[in-house]
Amino acid sequence: MTKIYPLMPLRDIVIFPHMVAPLVVGREKSIRALEDAMEKKTEIFLVTQLEPTCEDPNEGEIYQCGTLSTVMQLLRLPDGTIKALVEGQRRARIVSRVPHEEFMQVEVEECTEVLPGQDELIAYERELRKAFQQFAHLGKKIGEEVVVSCSSIEDPVKLANVICSHLPLSSKEKQEVLEVETLGGRIELLLEILFRELQLAEVERKINIKVKQKLSRAQRDYYLGEKIREMQKEIGQGEDGVDEMTELENIIKAKKMPAYARARVQKELKKLRGMPAMSAETTVVRSYIDTILGLPWKKRSKGQLNVLKAEGILNKDHYGLEKPKERILEFLAVQSQVAKLKGPILCFVGPPGVGKTSICQSIAKSMGREFARLSLGGLRDEAEIRGHRRTYVGAMAGKVLRAMQKVGVANPVFCLDEIDKMSTDFRGDPAAALLEVLDPEQNSSFNDHYLDLDYDLSQVFFITTANSLEGIPIPLQDRMEIIQLSGYTEEDKQVIAEKYLLPKQLKANGFQKDDIFLSPGAMLTVVRHYTREAGVRGLERVLASLCRKVARDRLQKGKKSKKYRIGEKSVPTYLGTPKYRYGLAEERDEVGLATGLAWTQVGGVLLQIEVILMPGKGKLTLTGQLGDVMQESAQAAYSYIRSRAKELKLEPDFYEKVDIHVHVPEGAIPKDGPSAGITIATTLASALTGRPIRHELAMTGEITLRGRVLPIGGLTEKLLAAKRGNITKVLLPEENGRDLKDVPAKIKNALDIKLVSHMDQVLEQALLSKGKNK
């Protein structure tokens, strides 16, 4: 009986029935044939080609006998090739070729197994087993596990196929065996090959013995010299008087480590003693021993528990950042009362440049501990965290243990920087590997693949940093104590610039500390109009630029002792035209124009929202590059206004007579989020009723269809934007009232803050009567 199958030609390999083999496939036709077989869940006909170098063999360039095989697994590799795992099933022969556009397809006929008589079959099987075992033990080209596996095979057909697949034969010889029709004939051919190989192996053994006996005098002298040196090492009399092995033994005895680690390193040392000095395995074992001995198993920093001293160090090094400072001082206070306290696992989340990484160093300094840092940005290989298994060439411990080895103590402050910037690929997920590192219940027995021993990380004070929680998996977030760091206010930036950044840049550019002075107004101008960021990195670069401009001016004018006093108006002389401007409150009350408050990664901003009405049929148009959430918020605001038409004294069918256009200026900047809901609703109400909106008022809050005002985030940044934009009155959701305690007093005192819970209260506060424009 014949059947049609896709065909894949093979180079330099013959697949036998019962043989499982991985194949790396690059030819397009072969890939299509594999995918077709996988998709249709059919077998594929694997046959060896006559010339391995032929790229596109035709029917006459392949053998006629092959193996019907099952495609067990397909994996597409980054270079476009496919790795396939196949298992041979039955022998078959090509009957004819069947035309196909994408790959070779043939009609094949399965080969029927012709078995000898029972007694003859038993004799064949015994001889084959005996010859194969002799060959395996004499030639040492076949592993012991293969011999054991073959000894458990009872089916003589399978036994012959498996033995032939493991013999070190050429493709041509294996093809000859595959094509023999009868089982007896195949076993006879195999026995002939095995006996020939046994004779060759015996000849090779005799030749080796003769070569060794004919070693030259110089070689014998070298051999004896090496032996004498080894004997001297055994009695501890090497070149320097102390044998290397003895030195390692002394280090092991002196090293404080757990009993299981000591037992492992002693076992490896014993193995090392019996290895030749020039062996590649010697280097591997020595590196492993050095790794174990280099780890700080029980060595700890003494540290200091003086809370007042720690607070002084933190305040000296960093301005602001109250939340992380408070958490560290709490930890020190508890540690002074508890003998053994597991290190916490903190996660500082905030925009770039606010000092997340640098405060980690200050924390280590304030606690009297060593500091280790590992950048996780761009990490995509799980083995970078857990290490590679020792079976791999060039294997080494993971980055966590290498950092511990470098820092030299078991209780450092360990900063895992940019934890949200890791990625995943076919080599694994580094975030999943960190689950054990950052779990207080598990990290006391962290198991690195290379070390293969439990290592205690429970005394490490882990701090991770991230710009956003979005890139961190939920299970990893659950293991960490999240501390949100907001951007600096303008006042904060001024203080940081005056106390830290400007003195640092003066020193870096060769100035004395009083050579350059910026007035408060000048510093505010630099902060407000030459930087737009949540942190202070850009501010430091601007101050560095100013110092360079002053240095050049001094040199050109020949006045090296001149003191520079820079006022607000002279800043553009050194830094050029201001780069940024911030939104300001409108100068007069307008109909259909309201001021909202938004929060971005670089701080708070004023958000102007405009609405105009046009004769039409009730179409609502939204422009200004609004995101999906903001568009839905606008739809909810519009629906609320329609539901309140009677209270707002609007005609019930007003929406059928006008088209409404809602626009948020600065259309090049994407905008999203629900917090503009009450602002949009107020603007719609103003445009439809003709009542102007107070120009000195700003608002923020999410709206529901029933008019409830829901809480928002980024409160401090939004209020700062209002203060900076000359806003005097702000409407906030009532539920955000509890968050006002975290807002600096100098911001709250400058604003008239009103808490609202319903949209009716917003309209009452925001809308003026008709004709009352100011």
UniProtKB/Swiss-Prot annotation:
* UniProt entry keywords in alphabetical sequence: ATP-binding, Cytoplasm, Hydrolase, Nucleotide-binding, Protease, Serine protease, Stress response
What SUPFAM superfamilies would the database entry show?
P-loop containing nucleoside triphosphate hydrolases, PUA domain-like, Ribosomal protein S5 domain 2-like
Q: Which residues form the Lon N-terminal domain?
A: 5-198
What positions does the entry give for ATP binding? G350, P351, P352, G353, V354, G355, K356, T357
The organism's place on the tree of life at top rank? Bacteria
What EC number(s) is this enzyme filed under? Answer: 3.4.21.53
GO BP: any one term? cellular response to heat
Q: Which residues form the Lon proteolytic domain?
A: 588-769
Q: What is its main location?
A: cytoplasm
The induction comment states: By heat shock.
Which residue positions are annotated as catalytic? S675, K718
Gene Ontology CC annotations of this record? cytoplasm
Keyword Hydrolase assigned: yes
Q: Provide the top EC class.
A: hydrolase
Q: State the compartments where it is located.
A: Cytoplasm
Which molecular function term from Gene Ontology is one that the record holds? sequence-specific DNA binding
Which family does the record assign?
Belongs to the peptidase S16 family.
Q: Its biological function?
A: ATP-dependent serine protease that mediates the selective degradation of mutant and abnormal proteins as well as certain short-lived regulatory proteins. Required for cellular homeostasis and for survival from DNA damage and developmental changes induced by stress. Degrades polypeptides processively to yield small peptide fragments that are 5 to 10 amino acids long. Binds to DNA in a double-stranded, site-specific manner.
Which HAMAP family does the record cross-reference, listed alphabetically?
Answer: lon_bact
PANTHER family on file? ATP DEPENDENT LON PROTEASE FAMILY MEMBER (PTHR10046)
How is this protein organized at the quaternary level?
A: Homohexamer. Organized in a ring with a central cavity.
What is the name of this protein? Lon protease 2
